[in-house]
Each structure stands twice: as C-alpha cells, then as structure tokens.
Amino acid sequence: MSLIEFPLLDQTSSNSVISTTLNDLSNWSRLSSLWPLLYGTSCCFIEFASLIGSRFDFDRYGLVPRSSPRQADLILTAGTVTMKMAPSLVRLYEQMPEPKYVIAMGACTITGGMFSTDSYSTVRGVDKLIPVDVYLPGCPPKPEAVIDALTKLRKKIAREIIEDRTLCQSQKKNRSFTTRHKLYVRRSTHTGTYEQELLYQSPSTLDISSETFFKSKSSVSSYKLVN
C-alpha cells in the first residue's frame, strides 16, 4: 500500500490559508458587527446621539442601531430607570438573542445618581435588573468615553469562550426586585404579569402608630389646609 502524498504548499497558497479556532472565528465576526438597542431615558443619551455625527462616526465600529430587541446583541441603557420602567427593560433584555451584552451609561443608570437618596421610584443601579458587562460612569459621559467603553467591550468579546458564556447564561435564573432592592427568584416575566409585593412607606411614618397618626391629622382643619 502506497502512502498518501500531500502536495507542498507554495508561497501563494500559504498566504490564503488561515488556521484558527471556532472561538476566535466567532469572536472576530462579532467584534465589528455589534447591533445596539438604544434605551435612552435621560440626558446621557444626548451624548451618545452625538456619536452618530461625522466627528466621531460610530459606523466605523460596525454599530447598526436597531429598534427591535430580536435583532440586537447590545443594549445601551442611558438615563434613569424607574420602577415602572423596570419590567419593560427586563423583557427587552430577555427578548434579545444570545450572546448579548449590556453597557450601563451614566451615574443615574449605574447607581441611581442624584435620585438614589430620597426617591422611592428609582432603581439604584440597572445591574439589579439585568447583568452589566461594561460600566460607564459620568454625568453625562463624554462621547470619547462611550467609544472607550465600546473598545473595552470589544476586547472582552475577543477573550470570550463560547462554552463558558453558554454555561454562565444557563445557570442564571429569572430575577425580580422590590422597593428595597433585594433580589428574589421569581417566575419568568414572559407571562406579562409583574408582582409588586411591597408598597412604599415613608420612614417617618413607619414607627408612628395609626392612632397617633390620625389624631395629628384631625388636629388640622380642612380650612387651614386649603387656605
């Protein structure tokens, strides 16, 4: 039996052959084809809108803004997220196909910003709702900072392994939040129902008995309240 002889590769054919792995090929194809879903609710989004102009030209990064979460693999949250908006944000994230990424842009998105101290309707950080890949602080961040965040995300994608991310996503459970911002395991939000188990109560009235509270209210006449 004669051995199989392979032809030798000359200089022309060797330059046209690429040896790589499936992970590197997948990561390379996703580096320059990020399709973001723009979730702008406040002034931080104005800074991102300036990237569309010719000065920064975010088209060179392959960014194609999409209006449907089913066609996007990146969601960029910019601005304040309230309790009423939270279920919609979680549903948009769940409708995005894998792999998907999140950039939290601005102080209001990351920590609640100036609303984090005495506002009962503001979410203190979007990472309590959806997992965040890149945090972009600022009030508001400059367009150069947004480009730097996109660059860091591209580097993170380049080092990613498909099996690890798939395993990590499969281990995650559905999450929900309360006004005290504690996470609990709940059923999927695809059902369209959202449970609000806790109502907000002012800390000043929590320790006051109902009898004392109504006595203090009855001591003020309606005439004084109106006038």
UniProtKB/Swiss-Prot annotation:
Binds 1 [4Fe-4S] cluster. GO terms for molecular function: 4 iron, 4 sulfur cluster binding; iron ion binding; NADH dehydrogenase (ubiquinone) activity; quinone binding. Keywords: 4Fe-4S, Chloroplast, Iron, Iron-sulfur, Membrane, Metal-binding, NAD, NADP, Plastid, Plastoquinone, Quinone, Thylakoid, Translocase, Transport. It is found in: Plastid, Chloroplast thylakoid membrane. Its EC number is 7.1.1.-. GO terms for cellular component: chloroplast thylakoid membrane; respiratory chain complex I. The keyword Phosphoprotein does not apply. Its cofactor is [4Fe-4S] cluster. Its main location: plastid. Coiled coil: none annotated. HAMAP family: NDH1_NuoB. Belongs to the complex I 20 kDa subunit family. This is NAD(P)H-quinone oxidoreductase subunit K, chloroplastic.
